[in-house]
Each structure stands twice: as structure tokens, then as C-alpha cells.
């Protein structure tokens, strides 16, 4: 009897978490569909803001959302080592939350640890392939590493999901750098 009650409780909890995540995914799918079709930058930025809001909110655990906010504040104030520990802890708690990986990738970028940042970006993109922020960060690292063709590919991937993405404006500049390198 105790085992079956325990099993039912576990089943209920897991269905709740699954439902919250699928609900969040449905909203994201809708926003990304709108983002592909929008034809003015003001509307695009509003949709982008909504997407970021969802990415920054854990689907089932408000404490993780609060920790992500705290880590982000630490990062903004330049306390990269402490922010890194906060994001590490979040990732251990929920390794499937793409935004925790993205924040850690950002900290590594700010610390000029580009290989670590790229590894974290790869994880972000495995969890959320449409993450235009991670793709933009990846492009910026490739620019710093003078891997210009890879930078363009990263931006082009982001533009598939977000055609009016500001990072698209980097492509002509990157192409100029490629020409300069070939001289």
C-alpha cells in the first residue's frame, strides 16, 4: 500500500513538471513562429524580450530562477568567480536548463576563457537550438579567434529563427575582415 501511494505521488510530480515544461515550450514555439514572420524591428524586439523572459524563468523551480538572477547580478558587477559558482550549482541541480548553461558561457566569455564558453554554448544549443543569444555569443568568440567563416555561420543560424536579429548587422563587417585577411 505504501509503495503504491509513493508511486502515485512520484507520477503526479513528474507529470506536473512535464506539463510545465511542455507549456513553456508551446509558448516559445508560438513566439518563434511570430518572430520569423514579423516585419518591423519594434515588434521583433518585443517578441525577443518575451522569449528572454521565458528562458530566464525556470519552468518548475522558482529558487533556480532566483539563483539565476543572483548569478546574473554578480556577473554584471564583475564578480565572475562567484557568478560561475552560482551557475555551476544551478547546472548540477538542473542540467537541462539551457539558460543556466548560457549564463555560464557568458561568464567564461567575460573571463576570456573562450574554449570553456564555446563548450557551454554547444550545450545550450543542444538543449535549445533556437537560442539566438548563444549563437550570437558563439559568433563573437569566433570573431575574436579570427574564425570569421564560422562566425558568419553562427549568425546565419540565428537569423533562421530571428530574421531581424541585430547581430545580422555584423555580417558585412565580418566579410570585410575576411577580405582584409586575404590581402
Mark where each language-model region is:
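TPR alpha-solenoid repeat register
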Residues: 100, 134, 167-168
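Canonical tetratricopeptide repeat
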Residues: 103, 137, 170-171
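Register position in tetratricopeptide repeats
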Residues: 57, 76, 110, 144-145, ...
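TPR/TPR-like (Sel1-like) alpha-helical repeat modules
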Residues: 33-39, 143-166
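Alpha-helical adaptor scaffolds
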Residues: 60-127
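TPR-adjacent "capping" and linker segments in tetratricopeptide-repeat scaffold/adaptor proteins
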Residues: 21-23, 52-66
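Terminal, low-structured helical/coil segments at or just beyond the last alpha-helical repeat
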Residues: 57, 152-183
Amino acid at each position: 500500500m505504501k509503495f503504491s501511494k509513493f508511486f502515485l505521488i512520484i507520477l503526479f510530480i513528474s507529470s506536473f513538471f512535464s506539463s510545465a515544461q511542455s507549456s513553456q515550450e508551446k509558448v516559445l514555439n508560438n513566439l518563434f513562429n511570430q518572430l520569423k514572420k514579423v516585419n518591423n524591428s519594434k515588434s521583433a524586439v518585443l517578441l525577443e524580450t518575451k522569449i528572454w523572459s521565458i528562458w530566464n524563468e525556470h519552468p518548475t523551480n522558482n529558487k533556480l530562477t532566483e539563483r539565476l538572477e543572483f548569478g546574473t547580478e554578480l556577473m554584471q558587477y564583475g564578480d565572475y568567480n562567484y557568478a560561475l559558482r552560482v551557475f555551476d550549482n544551478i547546472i548540477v541541480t538542473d542540467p537541462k536548463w539551457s539558460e543556466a548553461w548560457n549564463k555560464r558561457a557568458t561568464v567564461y566569455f567575460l573571463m576570456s576563457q573562450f574554449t570553456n564558453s564555446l563548450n557551454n554554448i554547444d550545450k545550450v544549443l543542444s538543449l535549445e537550438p533556437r537560442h539566438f543569444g548563444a549563437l550570437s555569443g558563439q559568433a563573437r568568440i569566433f570573431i575574436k579567434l579570427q574564425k570569421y567563416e564560422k562566425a558568419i555561420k553562427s549568425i546565419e543560424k540565428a537569423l533562421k529563427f530571428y530574421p531581424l536579429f541585430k547581430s545580422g548587422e555584423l555580417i558585412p563587417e565580418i566579410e570585410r575582415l575576411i577580405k582584409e585577411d586575404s590581402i
